[in-house]
Amino acid sequence: MLGIDVKKTKEELIISWQLAEITIPLRDVIEVTEDATYAGVEETSAIRIGTAYGTTDRILIKTVKQNYVLFTTNKVSILNAINAKN
């Protein structure tokens, strides 16, 4: 598994990358946007998932407890998974 894998269930968002798996309850998600900063530097406390270098796109997931920056070259696929209706 080289890239980030995102799955959405009725209650949570599951993000897998390498050996890590992060589960985010959907009720905690505030906003999902494209992050235009380089390496997500504006969100210094955000959890960074993926390889920051060699990727062209960043997706910012803001939640009640923690923010996440996903580094990817497959932005469309990840956003489609996040925005999918269940």
Curated annotation (Swiss-Prot):
Pfam families in the cross-refs: bPH_8
InterPro entries: PH_SunI-like (IPR055365)
Family affiliation: Belongs to the UPF0457 family.
Full protein name: UPF0457 protein BCE33L2265
